[in-house]
A protein has these predicted regions:
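Conserved catalytic motifs of ABC-family nucleotide-binding domains
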Residues: 65
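Conserved ABC ATPase signature
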Residues: 44-48
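Helical segment within the ABC ATPase nucleotide-binding domain
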Residues: 84-96
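Catalytic Walker B motif of ABC-type/P-loop ATPase nucleotide-binding domains
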Residues: 69-73
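ABC-type ATPase nucleotide-binding domains, specifically the catalytic core motifs of the NBD
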Residues: 7-25, 33-38, 129, 147
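ABC ATPase C-loop
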Residues: 61-62
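A short, surface-exposed alpha-helical micro-motif characterized by mixed small hydrophobic
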Residues: 110-112
Length: 147
């Protein structure tokens, strides 16, 4: 994010449709997904607060029209209300068919959103499967997730 550019300028700066998608991400679509950004379109990115910088970061990533959106702890350190907003947006992206790689510790959200789960330890896959298989595997949950 460029702090001396406005929200709008930050979105324009990353806009690209290299894959030639028929419905590329536009500012309007980003503003639909994150209405707060529409309210702050003319505001400098460096003055955003709460979860707004994270929303802008996701919006900027979407403006590149990625085949795979990678989100690494996208809600870490955010207030619960803002976290919920971002999870709802991720849900909407999934419903629209966006491929997403989520890295997070929030198992409740991951179970709801992920089609498939991987547990990594020191860079190696130690478990993989769907949410139902994970819920049945008490040993894995206890050892790696700590629930």
């Amino acid at each position: 994010m460029f702090p001396t550019l406005t929200v709008r300028e930050n979105l324009i700066a990353t806009a690209a449709n290299r894959a030639g998608r028929p419905q590329p991400w536009t500012q309007d679509r980003i503003y639909w997904l994150f209405p707060r950004l529409a309210e702050r379109a003319r505001q400098y990115a460096g003055t955003l607060s709460g979860g707004e910088p994270q929303m802008l970061a996701i919006g900027r990533a979407l403006m590149t029209n990625p085949k795979l959106l990678i989100l690494d702890e996208a809600t870490e350190g955010l207030a619960p209300v803002v976290r919920g907003e971002i999870w709802r947006c991720i849900e909407a992206l999934k419903a629209q068919g966006q491929s997403i790689l989520l890295i997070d510790k929030n198992m409740r959200a991951l179970k709801r959103l992920a089609d498939y789960h991987y547990i990594l330890e020191k860079g190696r896959t130690v478990w993989s499967g769907d949410a139902a298989a994970l819920e049945r595997d008490a040993t894995t949950i206890q050892r790696y997730i700590g629930i």
